[in-house]
Structures are given as C-alpha cells and as structure tokens.
Amino acid sequence: MGYLFDTATLAEVLRAVPSRLLVKRLAGVPTSERWTTSITVSQILIAARRTRHPKLMQDVIRLVAAVKVAPFDTLAAQSFAKLRTTVAPEADTDDVMIAAIAVTHDFTLVTRRPNAFRIYPHLRVEDWTL
C-alpha cells in the first residue's frame, strides 16, 4: 500500500507556489508510503530538460530522491494489457501505464486530474489540491 503521485501532482509540487493543501497532505505521508512511477520520472525529467533551467533540474532530482519509484515491470505490463484492451483502448498510453502500476501495487493514485483515471476499476484516486 501507499500513495502514487502522478506527473500532474509532482509538477504541482515543483511550482513556485504549490498548493498548500497538497504540501500539507504530502508532509503527513510517511516516506515509506510515497511513490511515483518510472513513467512520471521520465515525464518530469523531459519537461525540466526542455526548460533548460538548471534549478528546475536540481529540484526534480531532489523531488525524485524523496519518493520511491515503481517501475513498469512485467506485472505492470500485464495489468496495462488488460486495462488497454478492456476499459481504456483510446486513453493516453502514459496514463494507462501509470494506472496499471497503481493497480498492480494497490496504490492510491494522487492526481490533479482525477477524471482521467476514474475509468479504471479497482483504482483508488484522490486529488489533494482540493
């Protein structure tokens, strides 16, 4: 169990003035329960590289070090295939991969985009910015 933070949530944390509610909730989660995905890490690294701001890259590296990273492994790939072929044939591939990792590990997905993930059965979704 734990909380899986998606790209939108980690991007919010990296903002100059992040959501106070999100920061407060995040601070209350033990480090052992703070997770993200290898998909999210790649997305925020790409965004940081594109901005070419060294401070943002440093902030991303610090943020990634503060969470555990769940990989897209064989079990997640099996979940992905099931989700893609049953409930999400047209959904964004990265979103389906993130959902598959969350379902595989029984994580609660924390996102600023809950409606994008509500289609997945057995996936708990929360928005900590509200």
Where do the language-model regions lie?
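Acidic, PIN/NYN-like endoribonuclease modules and their adjacent C-terminal/linker elements
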Residues: M1, A99, V103-L130
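Short, well-structured N-terminal submotif of metal-dependent ribonuclease cores
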Residues: M1-T36, I46-R62
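Histidine- and aromatic-rich ligand-binding microenvironments
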Residues: F5-D6, T37, A91-D92, R113-P114
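Generic structural signal for small/hydrophobic residues in well-ordered secondary structure
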Residues: D6-T7, I44, F80, A102, ...
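Alpha-helix capping/helix-boundary segments
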Residues: T9-L10, T40, A76, M97-I98, ...
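Active-site neighborhoods of divalent-metal-dependent phosphate/nucleic-acid chemistry enzymes
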Residues: V67-R112
